[in-house]
Amino acid sequence: MKTICLVGGKLQGFEAAYLSKKAGMKVVLVDKNPQALIRNYADEFYCFDVIKEPEKLLELSKRVDAVLPVNENLACIEFLNSIKEKFSCPVLFDFEAYRISRDKKKSKDYFKSIGVPTPQDRPSKPPYFVKPPCESSSVGARIIYDDKDLEGLEPDTLVEEYVEGEVVSLEVVGDGSHFAVVKETLVHIDETYDCHMVTPLPANPLFRQISHDLAANLPLKGIMDVEAIFGPKGLRVIEIDARFPSQTPTVVYYSSGINLIELLFRAFTDGVEEIRAIPENKYCIYEHLMFGENGVLIPVGEQVLSMGSDYGKFYEEPGIEIFLCKGEYPVFTMVFWGKDREETGAKRCKGLSVLKERFGAVL
């Protein structure tokens, strides 16, 4: 049995832990927060600050098969980069690609340098889409409809044309020479631009080629998530994130049969093969529902989940998994899968009925 050590116990960590378990791996978690969200979901939990006590992590690396940073704490990532040669196992992370991807201005300059279509900067008239230079895609993002609202923005805020359309995502895993473009997904967003649901999409040759080019020109050794908008103007790449994603990998797993943790391991050991055809073509629904006042189920995004106190499995049967995130209001992560959309929809109805029976949820 392989063992993976995850540095970070929030939602990225949950996704990586979930897929590691699906691959039959043991999960060791390291987080400086004694109340780390997934502390009870991991097989082993060690609470310490890797920056203050790196020797503990280096010692752990002697008895695990890989270390995977799954956090967006820049100080932590930069510190791990500074000691990466001291680990006794591979660190499944491309630090240079992350340096480019976390800086949205650097990312956009990179897109332009290789001819990737992206929203126009500082358009002459509204609506504008504004976002901080270095946060996750949804944090601090909003639409501005009036020029006067630009006046209070921080100088380094990105101001782009607002592009209407569907938000789509595609993961790429590279070994530095070969780049496996995996499975397209649709990211369903709420009014705060946070994702509350993910579903699979058919293959899109243009998006796949662009994602391959983005990985190959780095060149990527690790995993990267490419996000784009499909709208009336065609495809526009909005960002890349060179770190293990949350939410989309589970949908990739059930719809394509590809486990991104296993693929990432191969990138640092045997190498990856470029994917010509997806091995499976099934359907999956992944969504977050908050149990609100009067039992009403409310779609919510990751920003709500991240405020929870504990996250673990609540219910399981073939084609259905439900996870409970405890907090002021419970949030359920619902995962349904089947051979097609119809079968998966029936699983979803069954899963919702479980919440009705056990919690009195209003459907």
Curated annotation (Swiss-Prot):
Is required for the biosynthesis of pyrrolysine. Catalyzes the ATP-dependent ligation between (3R)-3-methyl-D-ornithine and L-lysine, leading to (3R)-3-methyl-D-ornithyl-N6-L-lysine. D-ornithine binds at S169, L170, E171, D225, R243, F244, P245, S246, Q247, T248, E302. It comes from Methanosarcina barkeri (strain Fusaro / DSM 804). The keyword Methyltransferase does not apply. It catalyses: (3R)-3-methyl-D-ornithine + L-lysine + ATP = (3R)-3-methyl-D-ornithyl-N(6)-L-lysine + ADP + phosphate + H(+). Pathway: Amino-acid biosynthesis; L-pyrrolysine biosynthesis. Mg(2+) 1 binds at E227, E239. Mg(2+) 2 binds at E239, D241. InterPro entries: ATP-grasp, ATP-grasp_PylC-type, PylC_N, Pyrrolys_PylC. Pfam families: ATP-grasp_3, PylC-like_N. GO terms for biological process: pyrrolysine biosynthetic process. It is an enzyme of class 6 (ligase). The lineage of its organism: Archaea, Methanobacteriati, Methanobacteriota, Stenosarchaea group, Methanomicrobia. The keyword ATP-binding applies. Belongs to the PylC family. Binds 2 magnesium ions per subunit. Its cofactor is Mg(2+). This is 3-methyl-D-ornithine--L-lysine ligase. Keywords: Amino-acid biosynthesis, ATP-binding, Ligase, Magnesium, Metal-binding, Nucleotide-binding. GO terms for molecular function: ATP binding; ligase activity; metal ion binding. GO terms for cellular component: cytosol. Contains two adenine nucleotides bound at the active site. One ATP molecule is involved in catalysis, the second adenine nucleotide functions as a selective anchor for the C- and N-terminus of the Lys substrate and is responsible for protein stability. L-lysine binds at L11, Q12, E72, S246, E302.
